[in-house]
Amino acid sequence: KTTLLSNANPQQKDYNWGTIELVDFTSLDGKALKGLLVKPEDFDPKKKYPMLVNFYERSTDNLFRHRAPRAERSSINYSFYTSRGYVIFNPDVEYRVGYPGESAYNCVIPGITSLIEKGFVDTNNIGVQGHSWGGYQIAYLVTKTNIFKAAESGAPVPNMISAYGGIRWWSGLSRQFQYEHTQSRIGGTP
């Protein structure tokens, strides 16, 4: 017999919170990769689900990180989407210096394909979302594939060459350090 001890947070009954698991796949260059798959709590592998792809470098480090159900300025609200029957995929991306966009393609697309092969992804309803560095990668991806029904590329720098001499906000530094040697990984002076 189950005894209810408390009715704290009754608003939570309106959410299908979702579960998260680690998935394995192989990049187009043969590297073993991982990603996070977020599914509605009532997930049925025989059903088809719309899928949102959301990524920013490495996501698997956040396997045990709780995401609060709130609006974010640069990401999606995970509980909002799982409560509405979406699965969410966060693939890890491993970069090759000099080829940041191609690196994203080589990791993200085979990750999506591996989930499609499992049979529960509605291939007519796959969306992708990313912000800043993720936005740049999405701007690249949508020029290389038609797999996405919808894409949101927030605050991307789609042309690093034209922004190369700009000033990185809050730092006073030229963006060239960021583009050549840190996150953007173009690997040298254009």
Annotated model-derived regions:
Residues 31, 49-51, 87:
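Hydrophobic core residues within well-ordered beta-strands of beta-rich domains
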